[in-house]
């Protein structure tokens, strides 16, 4: 599968977008896009932490039977990882919005959180 990525920082000083993707069993694929919340500190770190933890969780816990539940668990797991990151760097507030696509067998699962 060929993936093309494009991001634009717009009028902000820093681009807080993060994109990661990878394969899952049975010729499946996952793509996660996150965007750090500009009003919060370390938005770029939040975006990377959340995207990578979602991708890793789904790859490590892949299940053909219950993908919607795996996706929800991955988002919860990514929030836990973000809170650990926030504490480790001493930030008071970190966050990001999430969009993700999982292609598994003949199904495409789309999920988002935030605007």
Language model features with spans:
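PP2C/PPM-type serine/threonine phosphatase catalytic domain
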Residues: 1-114
């Amino acid at each position: 599968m060929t993936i093309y990525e494009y991001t634009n920082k717009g009028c902000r000083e820093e681009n807080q977008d993060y994109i990661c993707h990878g394969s899952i069993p049975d010729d499946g694929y996952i793509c996660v896009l996150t965007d750090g919340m500009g009003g919060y500190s370390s938005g770029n770190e939040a975006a990377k932490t959340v995207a990578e933890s979602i991708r890793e969780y789904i790859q490590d816990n892949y299940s053909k039977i219950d993908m919607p539940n795996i996706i929800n668990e991955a988002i919860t797991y990514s929030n836990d990882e973000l809170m650990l990151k926030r504490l480790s760097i001493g930030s008071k507030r970190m966050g990001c919005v999430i969009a993700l696509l999982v292609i598994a067998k003949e199904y495409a699962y789309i999920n988002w959180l935030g605007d």
